[in-house]
Regions:
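N-terminal Rossmann-like NAD(P)+-binding subdomain of aldehyde/semialdehyde dehydrogenases
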Residues: 1-134
Length: 134
């Protein structure tokens, strides 16, 4: 695929210490039936992970700014948005609805839509019941 057309596709950056990171190392995500590239994902190697783990206390400090109840509420809201909302997709201004997520994941993984929806329901349940799990 041409570079210019790759630049219009959704790009999912790696996250480093809570911030998007546009890595030089990228993987193209392909629809299994059409062979069409549908997104590009930044990846990081073990060296970068090791470097970031040395600063893990920064992440802990950021989480300590919230109460447990606030984190549970944030998780529940995330679960609702995941199952029912339209969310940002990557760092190039794309968005994706839950139905689009089902079609995309089914197309790139080969899983039937019904299986993707079941897994979405499980993720939703886990996120909206964090308080019960804890």
């Amino acid at each position: 695929m041409e570079t210019s057309s790759l630049e219009t596709l959704p790009h999912l950056p790696a996250l480093r210490r809570g911030r998007p990171y546009d890595s030089l190392e990228k993987t193209e995500i392909v629809d299994h039936s059409t062979g069409k590239v549908v997104a590009v994902v930044s990846q990081v190697n073990a060296g970068i992970l090791k470097k970031d783990l040395q600063r893990i206390d920064e992440g802990r400090a950021a989480l300590r700014k919230f109460t447990v109840a606030e984190l549970i509420e944030i998780s529940a809201k995330a679960g609702e948005l995941f199952l029912n909302g339209t969310l940002p997709l990557g760092d190039r201004g794309h968005t994706q609805s839950a139905d689009e997520y089902v079609r995309t994941l089914s197309g790139t993984s080969g899983l039937p839509h019904v299986m993707v929806r079941r897994n979405m329901a499980k993720i939703h349940y886990a996120l909206t019941h964090v308080g019960t799990v804890l």
